[in-house]
């Protein structure tokens, strides 16, 4: 089973949005996908609950007594995580994932929070057995052609690990109500009218290529 983790302790950066869209994308490609919501807000579970039956099926992963009960035939597990996650829980989650995506919003506050989080993450990564987890960043909810858009691109494009390797910056997702409308209907943007979401689908391509390649695996 492959596990993809969406993590950034900063609230509202788009973790659940990215998690549900990735889950739907792989389910549409015929994979047996489970979506686990480690978040008490249960945004991903709420989304799953209203997902129309005729769309590609995604398994719900019940959280019982702090443990996730993942269906055994799962091929791809998507882990949506809460804001303000504490270190102990983060280490636990980091141990089981092969791939991690960090969404960041284009604001000075979010960039500073991401800097702090990445520092902590690098420390934790050394401590965890899973030092090989592949990480990528994405900029989310970006209003293009703004100074904030330039700043977030510049920041994400230049993040390096202590060994000098770059953390790949994989996508810029624009701010659009398409994500809001899709979420309201238990859908992904890949399940809305292509004419309306063409631009968004294009923006997802580099991230999806990365997820489909060995580069995103240890
Ligand atoms: N690219 C986008 N364009 C417009 N709205 C977006 C975009 N991405 C996310 N949103 C909206 O922003 C809000 C926050 O997104 P989301 O719930 O995915 O964030 P989160 O990181 O999971 O939040 P939390 O930390 O509270 O779990 C939601 O209303 C979502 O629909
Ligand atoms: Mg969430």
Spans of model-derived segments:
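Short beta-strand-centered segment that lines the nucleotide-binding/catalytic pocket of NTP-utilizing
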Residues: 29-44
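Switch II (G3) loop of P-loop NTPases
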Residues: 71-90
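Beta-strand-loop-alpha "switch" segments that mediate conformational coupling across diverse proteins
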Residues: 143, 153-190
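Conserved C-terminal guanine-recognition region of P-loop GTPase G domains, centered on the G4
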Residues: 112-132, 140
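Walker A (P-loop) phosphate-binding motif
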Residues: 1-28
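P-loop NTPase switch/communication element
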Residues: 41-56
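NTP-binding/hydrolysis catalytic cores, primarily Walker-type P-loop NTPases
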Residues: 188-218
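Inter-motif core of Ras-like GTPase G domains
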Residues: 88-108
């Amino acid at each position: 089973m492959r596990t993809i983790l969406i993590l950034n302790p900063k609230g509202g950066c788009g973790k659940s949005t990215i998690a549900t869209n990735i889950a739907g994308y792989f389910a549409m490609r015929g994979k047996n996908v489970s979506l686990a919501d480690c978040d008490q807000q249960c945004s991903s579970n709420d989304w799953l609950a209203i997902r129309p039956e005729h769309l590609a099926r995604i398994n719900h992963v019940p959280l019982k007594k702090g443990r996730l009960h993942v269906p055994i035939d799962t091929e791809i597990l998507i882990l949506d995580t809460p804001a303000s996650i504490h270190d102990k829980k983060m280490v636990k989650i980091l141990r089981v994932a092969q791939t991690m995506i960090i969404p960041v919003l284009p604001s000075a506050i979010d960039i500073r929070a991401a800097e702090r989080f990445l520092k902590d993450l690098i420390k934790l990564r050394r401590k965890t057995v899973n030092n090989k987890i592949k990480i990528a960043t994405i900029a989310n909810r970006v209003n293009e052609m703004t100074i904030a858009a330039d700043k977030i691109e510049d920041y994400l494009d230049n993040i390096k690990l202590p060994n000098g390797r770059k953390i790949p910056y994989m996508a810029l997702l624009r701010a659009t109500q398409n994500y809001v409308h899709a979420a309201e209907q238990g859908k992904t943007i890949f399940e809305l009218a292509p004419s309306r979401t063409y631009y968004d689908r294009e923006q997802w391509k580099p991230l999806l290529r990365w997820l489909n390649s060995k580069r995103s695996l240890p």
